[in-house]
């Protein structure tokens, strides 16, 4: 990483190439109270005589230390430093990576107090990183000035993220220089995964405590904001443009005039949620890393029932591998002859009639242009079938899906599929309850049956929409906070939908 070394005086800047400019240096200041100057000690003429040693050595018993807790956070060393001279003459050296030295430790102390989970934080250099996220599941980069990585470090971080690790970027005092540079680095590390605003109903805001707004030094109720990079449904990297570390350690950056940071209660609330998300989603991250997401697109075979997933302008591949796992479920449990892997098709270019079953998955907003929409409508009118699924059951995709369906069928209404519909009454499975996770039950209280919506073409359902995530259940790994069906129900409900399609 580029090193910006700064030394000396009241606040002196080294002139080495690549050093940060003065406008950035104002965000690298000591955080907290000034250290107390050492008292001057004068030697007097008298002193105490040496104390006598005991005649017999005191017995000492070996103290047994319990094993160290599992590591959760690795705070990464990067950048350079500034020397700041306080009015009392004391000089504080402030490092880019360590403006709040106890931030991670204090966060984990709060995590233990709230959840009972005990973890430790370690300090590491990227050169020390083994690359195995099981050893250090979270990397924390904090700072006030611009951060940059070498090509080798970017490659190492890319592998770490794809293997299931999570990266946090904390702007400490709300430095725009740090946040913007972190965003730029993530675009270089994972160019295929654009940075997105994390939606307000995302699990990371609702795990330990449901968070909407928190107190900052500038606002009593600032809406929580995170920028994130998603790998599949998993939030792999987050950037907090409002500082977190000051609040974790109950410190105030009073020397930074333009500081913007969460007060302790809000910072700890969000930090604990982030930590629980990293812990709870680790198995899902490892599933993605294991290669389930890398299945090759299937090819149509006249002896098999081909299934295709639609490519849109949005985050269409929001749950890689889920479709393939579902097809294997169909083959094992319902003896449906499939290719074993899903084809990925673009409405504009594909011959849709080759694929009698289409699947549309998503996270966030999306749209289809009018020609593609008209082509898809002709396909459905000719007997095709479309299943739309809401990854993690979030509100943004729900709104986008309903707008899309309204444009696709302007003359029809999307309606609830009742329990006495033939899809359920003649299906291979019966449902005694909703099959929701706790989060889905909280989102849709009072539901006692699976929640599906549909659009009919005469007596036949041509389109089915699930606002509660089906595909997450097909993956059969924990996804805390997701509005989804239980794994035991998701496969059976998907099988019921496919059985209806095959028989109608």
Model-derived regions, located:
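Aromatic-Pro/Gly-enriched surface loop or interdomain linker
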Residues: 20-138, 144-145, 244-245, 254-357, ...
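Structural recognition of the beta-strand scaffold that forms the well-ordered cores
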Residues: 74-75, 137-141, 166-170, 194-197, ...
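Hydrophobic h-region of N-terminal signal peptides that target proteins for export
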Residues: 10-19
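Bacterial N-terminal signal peptides that target proteins for export
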Residues: 1-9
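Short alpha-beta junction capping motif
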Residues: 5, 138-179, 357-398
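An acidic, glycine-rich "communication" segment
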Residues: 44, 69, 81-87, 105, ...
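Extracytoplasmic/secreted envelope proteins and their assembly/folding machinery
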Residues: 101-108, 154, 158, 179-183, ...
């Amino acid at each position: 990483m580029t090193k910006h070394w700064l030394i000396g005086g009241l606040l002196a800047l080294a002139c080495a190439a690549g050093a940060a400019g003065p406008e950035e240096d104002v965000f690298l200041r000591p955080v907290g109270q000034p250290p107390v100057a050492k008292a001057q000690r004068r030697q007097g003429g008298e002193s105490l005589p040496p104390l006598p040693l005991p005649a017999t050595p005191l017995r000492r018993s070996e103290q047994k230390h319990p094993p160290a807790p599992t590591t959760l956070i690795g705070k990464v060393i990067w950048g350079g430093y500034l020397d700041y001279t306080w009015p009392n003459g004391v000089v504080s050296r402030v490092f880019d990576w360590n403006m709040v030295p106890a931030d991670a430790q204090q966060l984990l102390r709060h995590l233990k107090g709230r959840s009972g989970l005990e973890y430790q934080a370690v300090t590491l250099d990227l050169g020390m990183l083994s690359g195995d996220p099981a050893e250090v599941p979270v990397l924390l980069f904090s700072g006030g000035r611009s951060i940059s990585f070498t090509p080798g470090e970017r490659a190492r971080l890319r592998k770490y993220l794809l293997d299931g690790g999570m990266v946090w970027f904390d702007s400490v005092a709300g430095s725009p220089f740090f946040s913007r540079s972190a965003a730029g680095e993530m675009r270089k590390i994972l160019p295929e995964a654009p940075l997105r605003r994390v939606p307000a109903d995302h699990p990371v805001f609702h795990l330990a405590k449901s968070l909407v707004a928190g107190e900052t030094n500038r606002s009593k109720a600032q809406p929580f904001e995170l920028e994130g990079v998603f790998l599949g449904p998993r939030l792999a990297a987050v950037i907090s443009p409002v500082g977190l570390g000051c609040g974790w350690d109950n410190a105030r950056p009073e020397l930074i005039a333009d500081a913007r940071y969460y007060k302790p209660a809000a910072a700890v609330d969000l930090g604990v949620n982030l930590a629980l998300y990293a812990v709870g989603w680790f198995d899902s991250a490892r599933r993605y890393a294991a290669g389930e997401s890398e299945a090759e697109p299937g090819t149509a075979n006249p002896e098999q029932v081909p299934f295709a997933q639609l490519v849109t302008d949005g985050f269409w591949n929001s749950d890689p591998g889920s479709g393939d796992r579902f097809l294997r479920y169909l083959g094992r449990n319902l003896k449906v002859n499939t290719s074993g892997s899903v084809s990925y098709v673009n409405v504009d270019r594909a011959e849709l009639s080759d694929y009698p079953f289409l699947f549309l998955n998503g996270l966030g907003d999306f749209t289809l242009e009018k020609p593609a929409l008209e082509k898809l409508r002709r396909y459905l009118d000719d007997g095709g079938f479309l299943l739309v699924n809401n990854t993690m059951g979030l509100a943004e995709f729900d709104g986008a899906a309903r707008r899309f369906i309204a444009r696709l069928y302007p003359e029809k209404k999307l309606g609830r599929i009742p329990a006495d519909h033939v899809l359920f009454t003649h299906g291979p499975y019966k449902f005694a309850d909703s099959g929701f996770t706790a989060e889905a039950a909280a989102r849709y209280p009072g539901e006692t049956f699976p929640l599906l919506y549909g659009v009919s073409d005469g007596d036949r359902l041509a389109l089915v929409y699930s606002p509660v995530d089906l595909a997450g259940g097909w993956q059969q790994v924990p996804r805390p906070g997701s509005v989804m069906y239980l794994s035991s129900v998701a496969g059976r409900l998907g099988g019921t939908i496919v059985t209806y399609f095959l028989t109608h």
